[in-house]
Amino acid sequence: MKKFFYLAIALCMGFALTSCNNDDDNIAVLTFEGTEWTALIDNPQYGGPLLYGEGKDTYGWTDARTGLSGGLTRAWGGNYGYSEGGVAISNYVCDSLQKHATYTYQLEVPVSNGSKNFAVVYCDATIKFAEGVNRVIRSMDICPTTYLLGVETYGDGYAKALTEAGDNMTLTITADNGKTMDVDFARDGNILKTWKRIDLSALGAVKSLTFTMDGSDKSEYGVKHPKYFAFDNVKVEMEK
């Protein structure tokens, strides 16, 4: 009887594990790794040929596996490249927060997440599925850029350090279905300093996600802090 009982438990555990594995079989992860992605990294970070020169008119990317795509927003007509906003590919890492808290180092993150490449969002930007399909994006890893984190931590003479109660810098992720999610990069003196995985499954099936940033320190032109962040390891539910 005991042998039968333990066998039953083992079988149940086996079925449970199999179920979990099968559920993960339809997950594709966008990591931005490979030569085709590295070719999209501009040098120098600001004023380079891909994001500001001849390449700015055609700069964009589409992941072959997930169909997720991004690029420059061309919000003002496209003449100013990445300065108008967008999603650029990067591999720059530097933790020199005070020296590199400037737009000339706009594609850097302060710490590696173990991979080579990642994406950097500036200003209001959108990623979408190129095929126009609806898919669930389960999660992604996000991180402040070195520029953003440096200004949040030390200020820069224009924007204040976000080290006090009431200070905040928040990312809002808006799905095309109308659902939204807020993620704090700074809140009441607590500042995100490294990579963080965020669960996006509550947004449901989406065609696109739009990223916007806002904060407590503002002028008549809007938030004073640099609106940059990085993301990586985007988990997407694919069709079974």
Residue ranges of each PLM-predicted region?
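Short coil-to-beta strand junction motifs in C2/discoidin
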Residues: V151-L171
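Generic short beta-strand segments
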Residues: I142-L148, T212-D217
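Bacterial Sec-dependent N-terminal signal peptides
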Residues: M1-F5, G14-A39, M238-K240
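Extended extracellular/luminal ectodomain segments enriched in beta-structured repeat modules
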Residues: G132-S139, V206
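N-terminal targeting leaders for non-cytosolic proteins
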Residues: N26-T126, G132
